[in-house]
């Protein structure tokens, strides 16, 4: 009494997926256009659980998409624009072939264009969703903004990425939302806290580009097209939250400070204003002029005895956050021409410091190197011939390490020509059992307010004691030999004279150690619990314990390596000291 029997592969998972070629034919698009549409709409291929069933018994490698995603793409208005663009190219080619130049101009003026606004609203229903997804957008825009003007990508795209990335950096400076910085081989990693969301991006170093041949720039350009639209929306909303004008404009007083007679030498009139914004040395103008900022005070409510500790901890955390934001307030920096100006200017301004450089390096210098109010001079040279007394001359790493340490570090380790301490990653969070390098322990001691120099002095004293012990070893050995001879002589005399003395003493009550007994009881309970486990649970438990033990072994191995390295350094130091 049942219905018609369905054929094989006409039900179940086989009907939920569709191959890429079938999807492309259904949408009537070429492969590049289909790929472009999927990138813009956020449609990705899926790997079926039972690939052979979906592939109708075949084992040939194929790309599969969900059928519901392809049906969703059928109603996309951009698909029609892609078809219009095909017709546009065909008509333009035909007009070129006939040498009808008036027709060429007319067709070019009517080039089909589309907007991605509706896709942005569709993919990100709320503004926080868009902020949460900024990581890749920022990394791609910062990468494209550094590209040279070659045939690999459009000049307009490069200029747009440059403008949007500069706008975003100015927002981070105005909101003081930067939290972490790390110099890696790939580039400079930044992490900011934007509206409660953690945003991490990477910017490449300012080196000349050698475009690799194995990279598909069309795919990258499609991603960039979407990301620039997204970043434009986000920048506009972020500027509104801070009451800043958008597009950004320099403050009247800041603009007056940045005016120089030699602007024409560095940039054209059309580019000079953008270069001033990109210098990041001036503040932005607001829609309503801001009043002098007052210190934000935390609201105090009647104390709740249950959550008193938690409230106190939150209050302390907020105070530390505010202190971190204003770490460089009151400090004036001057950057030498050999240091990475863009990164340092951005970081210093993000924490409330003032920064400038030589006027011949770039537009945007606010004071020169002779200014007596400069507190820190950032240089990257082994030695400086003429130094001014009332300022510190430091290597650039000091700025980056201060940001990650959330405090101003001692300057002695960063003087010009000094061997720098290791640049530790702020993104690594050590857990229980992990290896912690001595430099990190020293930094943690500094953050707690302790003085790690005392430990260093103790180590030096130990080294000196070891040296003295090495010198006195020979004398001690001779004295020990003489004492041994005397003892043997006395023992020979006393042989036979000693008698066995037996004493009876009162017994003592052995006091039971309660903590030790509790520990023994706990270990016994744990052992019994392990015995009562099921086979599957026991296997999982053993796996977890094996992982923990392996972690401890690796940490011990690293500690031994570090100890051997430190000992070899000490030996070399002693050899050098003896030579001198």
From Swiss-Prot:
Keywords: Nucleus, Ribosome biogenesis, rRNA processing. CDD domains: BRCT_pescadillo_like. It is found in: Nucleus, Nucleolus; Nucleus, Nucleoplasm. Signal peptide: none annotated. Residues 291-303, 452-483 have a biased composition (Acidic residues). GO terms for cellular component: nucleolus; nucleoplasm; PeBoW complex; preribosome, large subunit precursor. GO terms for biological process: maturation of 5.8S rRNA from tricistronic rRNA transcript (SSU-rRNA, 5.8S rRNA, LSU-rRNA); maturation of LSU-rRNA from tricistronic rRNA transcript (SSU-rRNA, 5.8S rRNA, LSU-rRNA); regulation of cell cycle. One of its GO terms (molecular function) is ribonucleoprotein complex binding. InterPro entries: BRCT_dom, BRCT_dom_sf, PES. Component of the PeBoW complex, which is required for maturation of 28S and 5.8S ribosomal RNAs and formation of the 60S ribosome. This is Pescadillo homolog.
